[in-house]
């Protein structure tokens, strides 16, 4: 039994079905990726797993317990969320924002203790935002803000991290650093991660298993090598790609093809057929 169990999950926005009979499980310490084109239901799944939305059908259990039975405070000690965008308009410093992640662990009077500050400084160091500690959050770039929000989530010391395209605003250096950190925490601390990714190469490099979604359904589930095939990508994303093997990492590598190359390939197929 996985730490997270999703069984026949369904949800609709009015008459539009966003998630349909979705099932998967995620084990402790696993990095699990959710893939699919825009509108495939990925963000809705994360909202359901974080209880922002309530399922219309099916069941989600965490650590053997129905997700709906957790209090908000209990859930915040178990699961942290890093959304794609976070609006913080008040002039909080970076340290103050990160310390917000300690709220589920504070005593009845809500004052930070020395251990809370120690956790905050540690995760700020891990995410590379220590030097920004006294800066106000609204002064930061999009990429800097996103690393602060990740630090806030890690300050919760959750058992599971839900990530909605967490590196969308980051340059390639910081993308790799964030995923290196997430992978290390999963291996060393048993942190379970469910992440939405649009970059198929990052998914292949860092995820243990993937679920590929299409129109709210689970199209396929498995290792990156099993999921990221030409046939699957063509069927779900409706585009031509080149798939090879990265000699350095041993991982699947996906390259999109431009219009001229796609037209040439189609002409070659017609000539053969």
Give the predicted meaning of each segment.
Residues 161-165:
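Catalytic Walker B motif of ABC-type/P-loop ATPase nucleotide-binding domains
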């Amino acid at each position: 039994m996985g730490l997270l169990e999703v069984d026949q999950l369904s949800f609709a926005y009015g008459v539009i079905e966003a998630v349909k009979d979705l099932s998967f499980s995620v084990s402790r310490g696993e990095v699990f990726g959710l893939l699919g084109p825009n509108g495939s239901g990925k963000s809705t799944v994360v909202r359901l797993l974080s209880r922002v939305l309530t399922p219309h059908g099916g069941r989600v259990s965490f650590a053997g317990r129905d997700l709906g039975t957790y209090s908000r405070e209990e859930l915040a000690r178990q699961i942290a969320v890093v959304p794609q965008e976070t609006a913080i308009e008040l002039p909080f410093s970076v340290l103050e924002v990160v310390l917000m992640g300690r709220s589920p662990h504070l005593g009845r009077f809500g004052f930070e203790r020395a251990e809370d500050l120690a956790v905050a400084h540690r995760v700020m160091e891990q995410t590379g935002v220590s030097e920004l500690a006294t800066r106000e959050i609204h002064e930061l770039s999009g990429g800097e803000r996103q690393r602060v929000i990740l630090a806030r989530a890690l300050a919760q010391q959750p058992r599971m991290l839900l990530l909605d395209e967490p590196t969308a605003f980051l340059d390639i250096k910081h993308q790799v650093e964030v995923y290196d950190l997430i992978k290390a925490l999963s291996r060393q601390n048993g942190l379970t991660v469910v992440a939405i990714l649009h970059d198929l190469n990052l998914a292949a490099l860092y995820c243990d298993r993937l679920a590929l979604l299409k129109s709210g359904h689970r199209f396929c589930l498995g290792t990156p090598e099993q999921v990221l095939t030409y046939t699957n990508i063509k069927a779900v994303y409706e585009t031509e790609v080149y798939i090879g093997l990265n000699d350095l990492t041993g991982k699947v590598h996906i390259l999109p093809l431009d219009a001229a190359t796609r037209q040439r390939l189609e002409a070659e197929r017609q000539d053969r057929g």
